[in-house]
Amino acid sequence: MPEQGGDAGPALALTATAFTHVGAVRARNEDTVAVDDWVMSQSMDQPTTLERTVTRPMVCLVADGLGGHTGGDVASRLVAERLAGRAGETADAAALADLLGAVDQALFAAMRERPALHGMGSTVAGLHVGPGGLAVFNVGDSRVYRIEPSGLTQLSTDDTPGPKLDDGRTAAYTTPLLTQSLGGWQDPEGIAPHVLREPAPGRYLLCSDGLTDRLDPGAIADHIDDDDVASVVALFEAAMAAGGDDNISIVLVRLRPA
C-alpha cells in the first residue's frame, strides 16, 4: 500500500480463487468472502476464480461471523460489503486501520438499530491492493499466509490469548476465545487492527478458522500446488475429512506484474 502522496508502483494483475462452505455440522454459513466488488456469503458448491487488473484500490478478504452469537451471518456480510465498497478511501496504512475501526462502529450502530442482533460480530483477514502496493490486515483469528516454496509464512496476527512469539504475533493456538473482533459483546471502545505492508507480487492464502483449526500450516501447505482451483478443493476436502465442524472459507490470491 503506498504511503499518501507516494509514487505508484508497477501495475499488478490479480487472480483470486474463492470458496466458502457451511461445513458438515453448522446449520448456516456465517462466513463471507470478497474479491473486489464480488461478495459471497452463501455456501458454494465449487470455487469461483476472478481476475482483475489493479487500476484502483480493492480488497480480497474472508470474514467469519462469531459462532454462537446472534447475527454472525449478518455481521460478516456487513464487514465484507463495507470494506469492499470503501477500499478506495484508504490511501495509506493509517487510513486502512481507520476504515476497519469505522466498520467496527457500523456493527455497533446496526445493533442499536436492531436490538435482536445485539452481540453480533465478525473477524476479518485480507489483502488491500492498489496501484502503489499491498497491505495485509486482520482483526480476530482469520488468517493470511504468504505461500512460498518452503511453506507458509503467517502474515496476520491472531487475536487470541495464546502465547506470543518474538515478533509479537500469537503462536498457533486453537481456542474459541478472541481478544478482539469487529462488533461482538464488548463495549464499542475501539479496536487495534493489524495492518502490515507487504511487497508484491506474491501468492497468498486467506482463510477462516474452519480451515486452520483442522489443519496445521504444514498440512495446509501439503495440499497447495500450482493449480489454484484444485488446491482450494483439496483444502476444503481435508478440512471436511477432519470433521468439518465449522464454516470453511478459503481464498487463494496471486499478484503478478500486469
Model regions: which residues?
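PP2C/PPM-type serine/threonine phosphatase catalytic domain
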Residues: 1-258
